[in-house]
Design a protein with these regions (language model features):
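N-terminal hydrophobic targeting/anchoring segments and the immediately downstream early-domain regions
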Residues: 2-158, 183-185, 189, 202-304
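Loop-centered beta-sheet repeat module
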Residues: 156-197
């Protein structure tokens, strides 16, 4: 028996498994905001163009996180249709002169393609209401030239017919600067989501924000160097209209960009999905639905 015990093989010692490495510390809100915006560039609803349209002034100063811009085509009232046509012509020529920076986009597919190519997508519009000359034919001409939004600021019989024509041909209805009653009346007619490219939610009562939410409209809010104040405005839009209605107009502090605002919203509990919507997905969805309605619309053209 002693011999059997002596012949027993020695016990095998198992190798020590190294401890799992400590997970990296979570990113703070600023780092998370920066990473999100790097992957999801902002679509800005309102880009002011220099009055001279000198090539040296373009492309317009923008935040580093901007991936697409709607270029305002507003002109002085006395310039009317002719002034707007000249502006469209000049803008198209200047975008063509900046191929490394800009690319005109006429559809949401072209918008996405421009961004994927590292260019800022430039969308023409909105055109000012006074530049229509009270004519549906002018609407159609602007659309043929690439304009994709018109700013409706009052509501009368022509406005009702114009909204229907805009739905038919695929022009977004921009309600920036319209009083609450005009917004209500326009929303009762349009079948496509409205845009407010220079939204002032503080000027709109809760019931109007609710109607905008039902419409799927996008309120594009100006970003300033006070992210907490802007976040307060966006929190109200989120609460009354829904997170699907929040968007960005432009920033008055392009050097700071959008990271401070998005970091503040993360601290307030906004989800990554909601912030992607704010950055660009909500605006893209509204434009895409406007395009789709135009393709499926069977409304007869409005009288000129």
């Amino acid at each position: 028996m002693a011999e059997l015990l002596d012949d027993h093989p020695p016990t095998t010692t198992l190798p020590t498994v190294p401890a799992a490495p400590e997970p990296p510390p979570p990113l703070d809100e600023t780092a998370r905001a920066r990473a999100l915006l790097a992957a999801q560039p902002v679509t800005e609803g309102h880009t002011e163009l220099p009055g001279s349209l000198d090539p040296e002034d373009l492309p317009p100063v923008r935040a580093a996180e901007a991936g697409a811009q709607l270029w305002s085509l507003h002109v002085e009232t006395d310039e009317g249709v002719i002034g707007t046509l000249r502006r469209i012509d000049s803008v198209r020529a200047l975008v063509a002169a900046c191929p490394e920076d800009l690319r005109l986009a006429y559809t949401t597919s072209e918008l996405a393609h421009a961004r994927n190519c590292g260019r800022v997508a430039a969308l023409l519009g909105p055109v000012g209401w006074t530049a229509l000359g009270g004519s549906a034919a002018t609407l159609r001409a602007y659309h043929a030239l690439g304009v994709r939004a018109v700013n409706l600021t009052r509501f009368d019989r022509f406005a009702r017919d114009a909204v229907r024509e805009m739905n038919r041909i695929g022009l977004a209805v921009d309600l920036s600067g319209a009083d609450p009653d005009t917004v209500r009346r326009a929303l009762a007619v349009t079948r496509a989501p409205a845009l407010l490219t220079r939204a002032d939610p503080e000027a709109l009562p809760d019931d109007v924000l609710g109607l905008l939410g039902e419409n799927g409209a996008v309120l594009m809010v100006t970003v300033t160097d006070d992210p907490a104040a802007v976040a307060d405005v966006l929190d109200r839009v989120r609460a009354q209209a829904g997170p699907h209605c929040a968007g960005v107009s432009h920033t008055t502090a392009p050097d700071a960009g959008y990271v401070p605002l998005f970091a503040e919203l993360l601290r307030r509990g906004w989800t990554a999905q909601e912030l992607v919507g704010l950055a660009h997905a909500n605006a893209t969805r509204a434009l895409r639905e406007t395009e789709f309605l135009s393709r499926t619309n069977r409304i007869r053209p409005a009288a000129a």
